């Protein structure tokens, strides 16, 4: 069901096309760091076609306007022959202009579609690398605890205590779900509330209770669409699902809603298609929500336990700020997420992700990895939070801007981070 997002039908430029024109080599070099082939030449060819189509359309519009004025002048001068010739020209222009406008629209959509599939470009200080092996350790908190026994896996403990039930969850919903009961159900709720209270009371975040179902254009705004459509869960009205055939696919897509994979999606989109006053920035938002992921690319990975579930609970942090403040805001967000683990006295490390391991929308990412003694042979670090600065990448997709003292609208910068994943902390 892949297709063009509704948000892409206008000319929304996800990357600064002027920057690509000015320095195509730098754009291709940034893509290479992401493990991608050069694209500047093909993008600029589409851009040139688009600009030529716009020029033709504008010239035709201008000529129609001037010819219409000349008709009046010719009639005043009683030059009937010239007036007739000009009227014929205007009629022809009226016929050709829809074709020219259609060519502009087609070129707009072609460029937007190509740009929509290109990830954000890494900042200069992001480490080189193609996968997790290129990530760089930034710092460590705490130490590995020594046990007089062999630690068990969390799911073995949970099942033995009667507080985790994967078998019944599978009957209800299939694989990668769990039923939490008794003390673990209460503990999960308490941990989530602790995280939320910490971020709102001590870190200055505003609590939000957002919708869990969102439109395609909202998913597009934060970068889940179009590339990761298969990783999402979708809710569709029963009447549409019952009548699915090839002719109904378009309507199915236009009316479906996506279950949020993270509260980043609705929180960041709170500023979509708007211009906020610079005095309102930074906006710091947080939410405790269920999250839903199809995990289409995770077949065979972490099939046991609560590490990789289709449904999980997470506290999300989102910041909307100005370009000049986003670097410091990234460090602040990381510190807020770390404070959760410090207060829980959990051993963790912070990793700076390399260019090839970052998420689609990120310019730079810090992962917080918590030590899990029951994982692997003798324990292992596993991600519990990911804090990313996205620059204006998401803002361009959402058309989210701020107005400074000079009155000129500029794109905001967006940041997001887990504060943290409740199930993994549990």
Give each language-model segment a name:
Residues 2-4:
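Extreme N-terminal basic, low-complexity initiation segments
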Residues 10-145, 163, 167:
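N-terminal alpha-helical targeting/anchoring segments
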Residues 139-426:
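TRNA-recognition modules of translation machinery and tRNA-sensing kinases, especially anticodon-binding
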Residues 6-8:
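A cross-taxon signal for low-complexity, glycine/charged-rich
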């Amino acid at each position: 069901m892949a297709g063009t997002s509704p948000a892409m039908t206008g000319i929304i430029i996800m990357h600064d096309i002027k920057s690509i024109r000015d320095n195509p080599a730098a754009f291709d070099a940034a893509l290479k760091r992401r493990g991608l082939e050069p694209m500047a030449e093909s993008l600029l060819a589409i851009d040139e076609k688009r600009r030529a189509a716009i020029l033709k359309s504008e010239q035709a519009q201008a000529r129609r306007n001037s010819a219409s004025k000349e008709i009046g002048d010719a009639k005043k001068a009683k030059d009937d022959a010239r007036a007739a010739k000009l009227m014929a020209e205007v009629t022809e222009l009226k016929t050709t202009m829809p074709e020219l406008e259609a060519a502009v629209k087609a070129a707009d959509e072609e460029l937007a579609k190509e740009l929509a599939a290109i990830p954000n470009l890494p900042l200069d200080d992001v480490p080189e690398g193609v996968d997790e092996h290129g990530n760089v350790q930034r710092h460590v908190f705490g130490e590995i605890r020594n046990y007089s026994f062999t630690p068990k896996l969390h799911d073995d403990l949970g099942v033995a205590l009667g507080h985790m039930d994967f078998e019944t969850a599978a009957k209800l919903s299939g694989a990668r779900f769990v039923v939490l009961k008794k003390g673990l159900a209460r503990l999960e709720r308490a941990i989530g509330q602790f995280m939320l209270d910490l971020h709102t009371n001590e870190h200055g975040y505003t609590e939000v209770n957002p919708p869990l179902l969102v439109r395609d254009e909202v998913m597009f705004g934060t970068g889940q669409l179009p590339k990761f459509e298969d990783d999402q869960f979708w809710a569709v009205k029963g009447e549409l699902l019952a009548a699915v055939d090839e002719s109904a696919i378009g309507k199915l897509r236009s009316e479906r809603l996506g279950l949020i994979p993270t509260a980043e999606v609705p929180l960041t989109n709170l500023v979509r298609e708007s211009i906020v006053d610079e005095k309102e920035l930074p906006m710091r938002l947080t939410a405790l929500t269920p999250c839903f992921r199809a995990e289409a690319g995770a077949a065979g990975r972490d099939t046991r336990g609560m590490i990789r579930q289709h449904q999980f609970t997470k506290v999300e942090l989102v910041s909307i700020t100005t370009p000049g403040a986003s670097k410091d805001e990234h460090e602040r967000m990381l510190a807020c997420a770390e404070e959760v683990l410090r207060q829980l006295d959990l051993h963790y490390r912070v990793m700076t992700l390399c260019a090839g391991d970052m998420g689609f929308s990120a310019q730079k990412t810090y992962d917080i990895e918590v030590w899990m003694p029951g994982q692997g042979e003798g324990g292992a670090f596993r991600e519990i939070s990911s804090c990313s600065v996205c620059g204006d990448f998401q803002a361009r997709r959402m058309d989210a801007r701020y107005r400074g003292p000079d009155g000129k609208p500029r794109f905001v910068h967006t940041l997001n981070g887990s504060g943290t994943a409740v199930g993994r902390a549990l």
